Design a protein with these regions (language model features):
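Glycine-rich phosphate/adenosyl-contacting loop at the front of the ribokinase-like
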Residues: 1-26, 35-45
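Ribokinase/PfkB-type carbohydrate-kinase core domain
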Residues: 30, 38-57, 62-186
Length: 186
């Protein structure tokens, strides 16, 4: 067993910082007031281009235990929704930023919550960013539930780009993209 950072903020933020240290990155989210939150912030601060001033503290840091089948590479995630489940549209920066990458739809309950005007709180956050001229990216998490078609389309309306795997794409569209191990083509 080993400890690794993960999630949209850590994965996308650190990858961009490694690719081009001149890109200014604002990490936005919540981490716990615990050792795991301290560790996460310390790791992000190792990158001078990552600004963590929009990361708030409270509760217990969220985490996932990931089980991987070596023979097939299949992964199963067991997630504890902790501090990052507090994230709301009000937590996002209001200044004009060139790109907003929001992840993950179907994992952040506050952002998946209903909004009278936009459908979901995540859709509201993306719409507000677009209104300021920000390019928006929606990242979706894999799950086995039936919420893909009821939650994701609201936010999808306000996403310039979409990060999904084939399973997520099929679930959002209501299509089965595979027949056994064969990818369907129509």
């Amino acid at each position: 067993m080993r400890r690794e950072l993960g999630g949209a903020v850590c994965n996308v933020g650190r990858s961009l910082a490694r690719l081009d240290a001149s890109i200014p990155i604002q990490a936005v989210g919540w981490v716990g007031e615990d050792e795991a939150g301290d560790y996460l912030l310390a790791e992000l601060r190792r990158f001078p281009s990552i600004d963590v001033s929009h990361v708030q503290r409270g509760g217990v840091t969220s985490f996932s235990d990931v089980m991987t089948v070596r023979a097939t590479g299949e992964r199963t995630f067991f997630t504890y929704k902790g501090a990052d489940n507090r994230l709301t549209p009000e937590d996002f920066p209001t200044e004009n930023i060139p790109l907003l990458h929001v992840g993950y739809a179907l994992l952040l309950d506050q952002l998946d919550a209903p909004d009278a005007r936009y459908g979901t709180q995540m859709a509201r956050a993306l719409a507000q960013a677009q209104a300021r001229g920000t390019r928006t990216v929606l990242d979706v998490v894999s799950e086995t539930g039936d919420r893909y078609q009821t939650i994701v389309p609201h936010a999808l309306k306000y996403a310039d780009d979409l990060c999904v795997n084939e399973n997520e794409a099929g679930r959002i569209a209501g299509l089965s993209l595979r027949e056994g191990s064969v990818l369907r083509a129509e």
